[in-house]
């Protein structure tokens, strides 16, 4: 997974930078939770250098969003209190395939904008890239004061091993993710993998975050207890139908479809709370649900379903293309998403896009 998954880089038509309106909207909606966590931390004595990490930073207009908010809030609050503002050290993390070149090409303009908005006394701000999986250690012990992550933790570290066991694999016939036709063992394997990964994530960050340090994490989730509901699975079902069409036309082998499984899971709030309590290193300060409308990919513009389907196809492709290409090859991508658009446009179902935002405090 670490060597395969990456958002589409650059700034072209299929890039993540140009097809991440939904993620940007979700990030914006999570800001009240982030701002409160930062303000609460300002009630204590801040260190001379505040160190923060953004995990799953990707590339594009969303990359510096949270960092800008955190640093500006701290600086303005220190000015209000008559304190000396700290220096800032920022780590931007993503998998090695991330387009870090685009990120750092945009850095000078971003730093200039921060100084313009906050005044000449702001900073300095030092930024470094940290390629690697957040399911492994990334930073020295007790060095982080803030950790932020958005639209990343729904990705698993791997496909559940029960689905890839060559001796006796579980078969999720005709599907690429959990669905109503999935055997119970397939659904259980996804939950087990999520629990393992999320617990590991908390354990690793507990080693890196200083006592009383904060984490604000936003990721896709669900409000219904049933993990096979349309709320979690509808778009994946559309993709599954599109793949089935390609199999029928001889463009994809049936075995290739049956051996592809998406390393992804949308947890319920109770599943999140249970793992936080079980791991024990963090206090859950807040947990909120963000529900975006079905057509949020349009950026607030009311469009017909066919236009929405085209935008949704681009958004999904920008995120999943690297994995589809690795397993199925380059040639199936255009016909796959052409069929996805047709399937989605012909349907009438509408579901909200649900994310969970949690604010955590490292126990002393």
Curated annotation (Swiss-Prot):
MF-aspect GO terms: metal ion binding; S-adenosylmethionine-dependent methyltransferase activity
UniProt keyword Lipid metabolism present: no
Cofactor binding note from Swiss-Prot or TrEMBL: Binds 1 Mg(2+) ion per subunit.
Binding residues for S-adenosyl-L-homocysteine: 16, 57, 62, 94-95, 133-134
Cofactor dependence: Mg(2+)
SUPFAM superfamilies to which the protein is assigned, alphabetical: S-adenosyl-L-methionine-dependent methyltransferases (SSF53335)
GO biological process assignments: methylation
E.C. number: 2.1.1.-
Domain of life of the source: Eukaryota
Annotated positions for site Involved in substrate discrimination: 148, 220, 330
Keywords from the named record: Magnesium, Metal-binding, Methyltransferase, Transferase
Binding site for Mg(2+): 172, 258, 260-261
Enzyme class: transferase
Sequence similarity: Belongs to the methyltransferase superfamily. Type-7 methyltransferase family.
Protein name listed in UniProt: Probable methyltransferase TCM_000168
């Amino acid at each position: 997974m670490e060597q395969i998954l990456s958002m589409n880089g650059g700034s072209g038509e299929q890039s993540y930078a140009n097809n991440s309106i939904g993620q940007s909207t979700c990030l914006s909606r999570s800001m009240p939770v982030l701002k409160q966590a930062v303000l609460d931390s300002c009630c204590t004595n801040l260190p001379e250098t505040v160190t923060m990490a953004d995990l799953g930073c990707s590339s594009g207009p969303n990359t510096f969003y949270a960092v800008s908010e955190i640093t500006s809030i701290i600086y303005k609050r220190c000015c209000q209190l008559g304190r000396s503002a700290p220096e800032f050290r920022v780590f931007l993390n993503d998998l090695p395939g991330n387009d870090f070149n685009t990120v750092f090409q945009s850095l000078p303009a971003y730093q200039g904008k921060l100084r313009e908005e906050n005044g000449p006394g702001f900073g300095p701000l030092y930024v470094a890239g940290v390629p690697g999986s957040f399911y492994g250690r990334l930073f020295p012990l007790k060095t982080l004061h803030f950790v932020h992550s958005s639209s990343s933790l729904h990705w698993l570290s791997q496909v559940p091993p029960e689905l890839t066991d060559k001796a006796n694999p579980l078969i999720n016939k005709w599907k690429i993710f959990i669905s109503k036709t999935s055997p119970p063992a397939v659904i259980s394997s996804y939950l087990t993998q999520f629990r393992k990964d999320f617990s590991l994530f908390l354990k690793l960050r507990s080693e890196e975050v200083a006592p009383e340090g904060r984490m604000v994490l936003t990721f896709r989730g669900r409000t219904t207890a049933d993990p096979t509901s349309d709320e979690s699975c509808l778009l994946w079902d559309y993709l599954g139908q599109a793949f089935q069409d390609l199999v029928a036309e001889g463009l994809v082998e049936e075995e290739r479809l049956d051996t592809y499984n998406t390393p992804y899971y949308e947890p319920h709030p109770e599943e999140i709370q249970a793992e936080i309590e079980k791991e024990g290193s963090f206090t859950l300060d807040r947990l909120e649900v963000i529900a975006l409308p079905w057509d949020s990919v349009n950026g607030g513009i009311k469009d017909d379903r066919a236009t929405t389907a085209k935008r949704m196809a681009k958004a999904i492709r920008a995120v999943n293309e690297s994995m589809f290409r690795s397993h199925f090859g380059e040639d199936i991508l255009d016909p796959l998403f052409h069929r996805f658009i047709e399937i989605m446009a012909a349907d009438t179902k509408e579901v909200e896009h649900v994310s969970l935002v949690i604010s955590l405090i490292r126990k002393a």
